[in-house]
């Protein structure tokens, strides 16, 4: 198994555990998708993917419909996606994806978390290169052979395909998302969920006390309403 498999195994059950937080993130994704490509999922592949993800976290259908309707209102502010980079204690690189309607607020908040937890907020590009930006798709196993599927999808950008208890996961570079999404839909394969992740190229092992220092910063960052995802180079 490759790095995507190990990364997924390490993060399982750790992030997106709070349902309310998941709903908030999906809501923001819906707004950004509708503002970008319109409210019709059939004509908006990004919105189609978000709706699939809403089902994966059991978000009520009426919540999704309400969010789409709200997003079509020209008075509804769009969210800007901003990437923050820095270091936690003990040399652990931190990469933070945010979606904010107030850039100044978000910058000030993220900086304060680093300062309070003995971290250092970095400049653009300071740690992003340490992570591979990937896309992923979860589909039902339905008796499919992951190895055969991987061979079939290599030409569309797939790099790693493996099975777990929840189905089959497909990993590919960030830029292959649209190509693989289209191919799966063309084949009539149900997409249970999809998304993007940043996988650290190298991880660092820490002591329990050092892990606690890093987790303190990560938890503080994750509590912020503007934060969508936090990635790091700490071994899990």
UniProtKB/Swiss-Prot annotation:
For this protein, the record's SUPFAM superfamilies field holds: YebC-like (SSF75625)
Please give the Gene Ontology molecular function terms for this protein.
Answer: DNA binding
What keywords are assigned to this protein?
Cytoplasm, DNA-binding, Transcription, Transcription regulation
Picking any one GO biological process from the record gives: regulation of DNA-templated transcription
Would I find Protein transport among this entry's keywords? no
Q: Which InterPro entries match?
A: Integrase-like_N, TACO1_YebC-like_2nd/3rd_dom, TACO1_YebC_N, Transcrip_reg_TACO1-like, Transcrip_reg_TACO1-like_dom3, YebC-like
Q: Does the keyword DNA-binding apply?
A: yes
Q: Known Gene3D superfamilies for this protein?
A: 1.10.10.200, 3.30.70.980
Q: Which GO terms describe its cellular component?
A: cytosol
Subcellular location(s) of the protein: Cytoplasm
What top-level branch of life does the organism fall under? Answer: Bacteria
One Pfam entry name: Transcrip_reg
**PANTHER family membership:** TRANSCRIPTIONAL REGULATORY PROTEIN YEBC-RELATED (PTHR12532:SF6), TRANSLATIONAL ACTIVATOR OF CYTOCHROME C OXIDASE 1 (PTHR12532)
Record-stated family: Belongs to the TACO1 family.
- HAMAP family assigned: Transcrip_reg_TACO1
| UniProt protein name | Probable transcriptional regulatory protein FP0835
Organism of this sequence: Flavobacterium psychrophilum (strain ATCC 49511 / DSM 21280 / CIP 103535 / JIP02/86)
């Amino acid at each position: 198994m490759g790095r995507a498999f190990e990364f997924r195994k390490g993060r399982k059950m750790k992030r997106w555990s709070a349902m309310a937080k998941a709903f908030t993130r999906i809501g923001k994704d819906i707004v950004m998708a509708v503002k970008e490509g319109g409210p019709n999922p059939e004509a908006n592949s990004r919105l189609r993917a978000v709706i699939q993800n809403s089902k994966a976290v059991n978000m009520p259908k009426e919540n999704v419909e309400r969010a789409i309707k709200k997003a079509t209102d020209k008075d509804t502010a769009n969210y800007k996606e901003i990437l923050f980079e820095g270091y936690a204690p003990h040399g652990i690189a931190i990469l933070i994806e945010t979606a904010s309607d107030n850039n100044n607020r978000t910058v000030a908040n993220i900086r304060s978390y680093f300062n309070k937890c003995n971290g250092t907020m970095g400049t653009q590009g300071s740690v992003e290169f340490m992570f591979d930006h990937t896309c992923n798709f979860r589909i039902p196993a339905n008796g499919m052979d992951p190895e055969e599927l991987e061979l079939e999808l290599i030409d569309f950008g797939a790099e790693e395909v493996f099975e777990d208890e929840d189905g089959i996961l497909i990993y590919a570079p960030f830029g292959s998302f649209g190509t693989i999404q289209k191919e799966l839909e063309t084949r009539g394969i149900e997409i249970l969920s999809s998304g993007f992740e940043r996988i650290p190229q190298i991880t660092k092992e820490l002591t329990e006390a050092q892990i606690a220092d890093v987790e303190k910063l990560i938890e503080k960052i994750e509590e912020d309403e503007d934060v969508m995802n936090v990635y790091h180079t700490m071994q899990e």
